[in-house]
Amino acid sequence: MLLIGVAGTTLSAQEVDWLQDDAVAGVVLFKRNFASRAQIVELSAALREAAPRPLLLAVDQEGGRVQRFHEGYSALPPLQGIGALYVRDPEAALELAFEHAWLMASEVRASGVDLSFAPVVDLGRGNRAIGDRAFSDDPHVVAAFAKAYVQGMHAAGMPVTLKHFPGHGSVLEDTHVDLAVDVRALETLESEDLVPFAAGIAAGADAVMMAHVVYPNVAPEPAGFSAHWIEVILRGRMGFRGVVFSDDIGMAAVRGVGGVVGCVHAHLDAGCDVVLVCHPELVNDALSAVAGRRSNTAALIGLIGRGVLGWDGLLADVRYGSIQSHLFERFGTST
């Protein structure tokens, strides 16, 4: 029901107490939780040991400027860099996307973390928050990359989360700090922004993360608060059967919607399976909000613990060094 954030590199007594609550489905990790590769392995183990049930551990490890784990991990290029190669050599670009996905997912899984919220399949059309996180401004190019990225993550044993549904890339505003409104008609969205999501779903994506964007010509509320977007369009028209995550409820775009309690209820009532409460100072209010609600954490079981390879196993895998070298040759990235 809730995916919460914790404050530092070790667990406090209060955080251990939070993990006892059945409403806590897992923990999302950030740069503030990272000190070293070994420390992340230890923190992952400590989180699982502290929880009385299977716990989902997640991170944003997209590459480029959104990469929470650094030292000891491959410095992954942003997706835009891979997307730029598509015009010259589509086949090579898609192979690089597969390798990028496999490398990212393998390193995260080796650290005891279940999933990275990836890939971004928003269109790259000037949004302040998306920027070089997007493959391209062309829906069909992004769709091709979405398929390749799903395949690469799955090859590494990691579930896939497409984000940010139904598309964050065509508005200017950054929902971390401002309300974003997209006035286009549904027909336009279906022929543009929804195309990569449809491709990713068809390729077997396991989860979708919602956008904190309002599309007033489709529904009056932000997409994550909208049963029309989640139940009618995503699950109904598009046939998605996986897990639906909210984006972080600490963002300014949704902060004014009834406070933490109102925001949590709005997401769950609309059909989100899991609400992200990334700021520890909001966790107590979020837990109060869900007290008495029936827990639906069973929806996440398929995302948790698909077998942890461990770093020794990954470093011994010949694919690891080969893919690292290939990406380094193309983009000048390394550990």
Swiss-Prot record:
BP terms from Gene Ontology: carbohydrate metabolic process; cell division; cell wall organization; peptidoglycan biosynthetic process; peptidoglycan turnover; regulation of cell shape
GO cellular component, one term: cytoplasm
A Gene Ontology molecular function term of the record: beta-N-acetylhexosaminidase activity
Subcellular location: Cytoplasm
HAMAP family referenced in this protein's UniProt entry, alphabetically: NagZ
Function: Plays a role in peptidoglycan recycling by cleaving the terminal beta-1,4-linked N-acetylglucosamine (GlcNAc) from peptide-linked peptidoglycan fragments, giving rise to free GlcNAc, anhydro-N-acetylmuramic acid and anhydro-N-acetylmuramic acid-linked peptides.
NCBIfam families per record: PRK05337.1
The protein, known as: Beta-hexosaminidase
Organism: Xylella fastidiosa (strain Temecula1 / ATCC 700964)
Gene: nagZ
